[in-house]
């Protein structure tokens, strides 16, 4: 009897049923939204580790092939005048494999693009300025690093300051927030690179003071240019690249256009400097034969492009700082492969290299844990907001 008693404090069966029907779409939408978010997060993590794999693979292969190139051309000898030459060729090769990325971009768009992208004239102007800026920076740090690693015995230590510049630039340009895990990651990955220096084939012998000073300044400005390029990339993804563009397409588009501009600049430098004349001599005198000379240059260019694609992908997915941390964490891995492949000066895998590898792994893991905590925090916030609604 009380079941049918009208009271403001009670809800009738009919009203309760109506409320249940009204809440069904909301519950269904919530479940679908949760599943979609879980899928997006899982795909994001997969992309993070794939891009990190690109960076490590590209770093290892490029280091091995660059050592191989220096040995086979005789540039590893201290008394060889060619030791300080070929910097424009190196910077050219570092960017020249962009057609391979352009092909992948066209293939991706033909398979997965559902509609054509339209851009306003103002958007086109911003994109043009972005790609020009990145292309100039790409060519600058490619050439400066090529000079630095062949002229300065302290190259690796100066190279380590790249993390400091990236941290400063990303805090100013990208408003990046730091926490203890990110700071720990920066320290560990910096240590990993700082103590892993070895006698590579392109490692300079003791030379005149002016050459050492010249190489040191080139290394320094190269770190500034590289750090700035990463932060400008992140700004481009945040402010310039259209939101309708897929992440994969945006990454390949940025890498292709910036590398194309850098290649043109380095090609001009190659001819203006006269270094193009040395290519024929290297081709004729390559110790393992002409075919392997061509294959080594192609492989070196592709390896650099794979690493660059991974770096740009990490900037898009996470941040410029994380991209740099992964690059530094990969250095000990590349160094160990160099020791295994060439055994320079009876070098072996000792405590320093083992410690550097461990520091690199822990530095990478520390930043990944920071990303994991940030994602969990976002999920909790979104769930709380959904409950309020």
UniProtKB/Swiss-Prot annotation:
Signal peptide: none annotated. Coiled coil: none annotated. It holds the Pfam family PUNUT. It is found in: Membrane. One of its GO terms (molecular function) is purine nucleobase transmembrane transporter activity. It is a multi-pass membrane protein. The chain crosses the membrane at residues 46-66, 88-108, 127-147, 153-173, 181-201, 217-237, 251-271, 297-317, 322-342, 349-369. InterPro entries: PUP_plant (IPR030182). Keywords: Membrane, Transmembrane, Transmembrane helix, Transport. Its main location: membrane. One of its GO terms (cellular component) is membrane. Belongs to the purine permeases (TC 2.A.7.14) family. This is Putative purine permease 20.
């Amino acid at each position: 009897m009380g079941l049918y008693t009208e009271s403001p404090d009670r809800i009738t069966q009919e009203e309760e049923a109506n409320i249940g029907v009204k809440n069904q779409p909301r519950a269904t939408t919530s479940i679908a939204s949760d599943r979609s978010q879980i899928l997006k997060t899982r795909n994001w993590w997969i992309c993070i580790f794939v891009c990190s794999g690109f960076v490590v693979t590209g770093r290892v292969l490029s280091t091995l092939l660059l050592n191989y190139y220096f040995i086979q051309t005789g540039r590893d000898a201290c008394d060889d005048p060619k030791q300080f030459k070929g910097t424009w060729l190196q910077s050219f090769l570092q960017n020249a494999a962009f057609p391979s990325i352009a092909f992948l971009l066209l293939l991706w768009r033909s398979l997965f693009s559902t509609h054509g992208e339209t851009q306003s004239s103002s958007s086109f102007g911003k994109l043009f300025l972005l790609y020009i800026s990145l292309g100039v920076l790409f060519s600058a740090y490619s050439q400066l690093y090529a000079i630095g690693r062949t002229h300065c015995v302290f190259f690796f230590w100066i190279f380590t300051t790249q993390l400091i510049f990236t941290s400063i630039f990303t805090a100013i340009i990208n408003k990046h927030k730091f926490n203890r895990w990110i700071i720990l990651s920066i320290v560990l990955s910096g240590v990993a690179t700082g103590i892993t220096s070895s006698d590579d084939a392109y490692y300079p012998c003791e030379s005149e003071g002016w050459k050492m000073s010249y190489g040191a300044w080139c290394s320094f400005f190269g770190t500034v240019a590289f750090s700035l390029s990463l932060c400008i990339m992140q700004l481009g993804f945040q402010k310039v690249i259209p939101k309708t563009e897929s992440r994969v397409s945006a990454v390949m588009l940025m890498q292709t256009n910036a590398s194309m501009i850098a290649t043109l600049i380095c090609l001009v430098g190659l001819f203006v400097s006269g270094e193009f004349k040395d290519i024929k001599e290297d081709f004729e005198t390559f110790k393992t034969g002409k075919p392997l000379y061509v294959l080594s240059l192609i492989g070196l260019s592709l390896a650099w492009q794979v690493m660059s694609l991974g770096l740009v992908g990490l900037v898009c997915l996470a941040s410029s700082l994380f991209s740099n941390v992964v690059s530094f964490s990969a250095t000990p891995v590349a160094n160990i492969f160099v020791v295994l492949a060439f055994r320079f000066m009876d070098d072996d895998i000792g405590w320093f290299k083992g410690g550097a590898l461990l520091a690199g792994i822990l530095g990478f893991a520390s930043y990944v844990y920071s990303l994991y905590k940030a994602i969990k925090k976002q999920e909790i916030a979104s769930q709380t907001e959904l409950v309020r609604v």
